[in-house]
Regions:
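Eukaryote-biased, non-catalytic alpha-solenoid scaffold regions
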Residues: 2-420
Length: 420
């Protein structure tokens, strides 16, 4: 175990050395950025161990240093791999753990931790990263009492005033309103700050809080109203199926918790037809419970087909072993034929071979270089694996005759012909 007093120097030296080693001619490429991120992860692991050993302030100070270093890196390194974002999110989670532990300690430590967070959040490194700046300040809210809250409010006022010169000051204004509300809610409670919450209900983050409050109070009509106002206003392409706080996903949760089966079915069907295939199983379960699955099965598949959510529709056809429907859909639209063909070739070999012949012929007419020719012959090789040797042989002969002046294509065709 590393002594607590050594953690911060080790973290600072590790990150500095890693940045220096991975900087080449003043530039940090994506692989070098990932190397630095791995070193940062090691530092975060040290911080976690320190936190577990009750070194609360040391862990917090080291974690905020890692955060600031990560934000700096985001401004000038190639962080396209996504690893840096993961490090930063992990760091926020660790900072929050630190402040939750410090919240239980004496006032002196709480005030010290709050002062550290405010000081770090004011740094110019967060200019241009407004959400990250205010995410850090949110971590400090749990440390506030009415007296120390004035320091946080003063810091918020300073940041808001400085933002007047920004190109988009409204971003800072929005974050300021959110943090201010969360601070007031922490100090005065949910009921005493409800008016402030509804005054700023246009902000998505605060609307979500209001919805969750309404659900907690079993006021499902209010939760539904707040959710519908946004869900009905947005286009379907805004839908984020994997986001639990997407308005449409939240609306389904409201109906489920309220035990409103009719609205649950309607919303689940809506989400399915928007391409969220997990709601197929949801609908199956609900319909089975009321003995109505068989009578709704075919019509539900028809609606899904008409929705033009091809990937979702075909995925469900595969899971339900609906080979005939899948073949019909692939024949109408040979999109990703060589993926879906493996599910069809056993029962419908001739139809699949014919589709492959046509698809490869059309692709070859558009191909212009060896890279594209390789893709074509890869598909021919797949056709051979599916025991479509006669079709593959005829196709190769036709392509040779049709394109005698494409030596690169002829070369690739000769290679795949050897597999026959």
């Amino acid at each position: 175990m590393i002594p607590t007093e050594d953690i911060i120097p080790i973290v600072k030296n590790t990150i500095a050395a890693s940045i220096k080693f991975n900087t080449h001619r003043g530039y940090i490429g994506w692989s070098s950025c990932d190397n630095i991120c791995m070193d940062m992860h090691d530092c975060l692991d040290m911080c976690t161990e320190t936190l577990e050993m009750c070194g609360y302030m040391t862990a917090l100070e080291a974690a905020t240093y890692i955060l600031v270093s990560g934000v700096k890196l985001a401004s000038h390194a190639d962080s396209s791999s996504g690893m840096l974002t993961d490090v930063i999110m992990y760091t926020y989670a660790l900072i929050e753990k630190c402040t939750k532990e410090i919240e239980k300690q004496d006032k002196q430590m709480r005030d010290q931790a709050l002062a550290l967070i405010i000081k770090e959040a004011k740094k110019s490194v967060f200019d241009g990263w407004i959400d990250w700046r205010y995410d850090l300040l949110k971590c400090g809210i749990c440390l506030c009492d009415e007296k120390s809250a004035k320091k946080l409010e003063k810091g918020l006022d300073t940041l808001l005033e400085n933002s007047r010169e920004d190109y988009f000051p409204e971003y800072t204004e929005k974050e300021d309103l959110i943090v201010s509300y969360l601070l007031h809610r922490h100090l005065y409670g949910k009921k005493n700050t409800q008016k402030e919450l509804y005054q700023n209900i246009a902000l998505n983050e605060l609307r979500i809080i209001a919805i969750k409050d309404a659900m907690e109070d079993k006021n499902y009509d209010e939760a539904e109203k707040l959710c519908l106002e946004k869900a009905n206003a947005e286009e379907t392409w805004h839908y984020h199926s994997s986001d639990p706080e997407d308005w449409n996903n939240m609306l389904y949760d409201i109906y489920k918790i309220a035990n409103n089966t009719e609205k649950q079915i309607a919303q689940a069907k809506k989400l399915l037809l928007m391409g969220n295939e997990k709601f197929w199983d949801v609908l199956k379960q609900i319909y089975n419970e009321c003995g109505a699955w068989n009578e709704n099965y075919e019509s539900l598949l028809d609606e899904l087909k008409d929705s033009k959510r091809t990937v979702c529709y075909r995925s469900i056809l595969i899971s339900e072993n609906e080979k005939k429907r899948l073949l019909e859909d692939v024949m109408e639209n040979p999109y990703d034929l060589f993926y879906y063909g493996k599910y069809l070739v056993k029962e419908y070999p001739e139809q699949v071979y014919e589709l492959c012949y046509k698809e490869i012929s059309e692709s070859c007419a558009q191909a212009k270089d060896r890279r594209e020719y390789k893709k074509i012959t890869k598909n021919i090789a797949q056709l051979i694996k599916w025991k479509g040797n006669d079709t593959a042989k005829s196709l190769i002969e036709e392509l040779k005759q049709r394109y005698p002046r494409k030596p690169a294509l002829l070369d690739e065709l000769e290679k795949v012909e050897k597999k026959l």
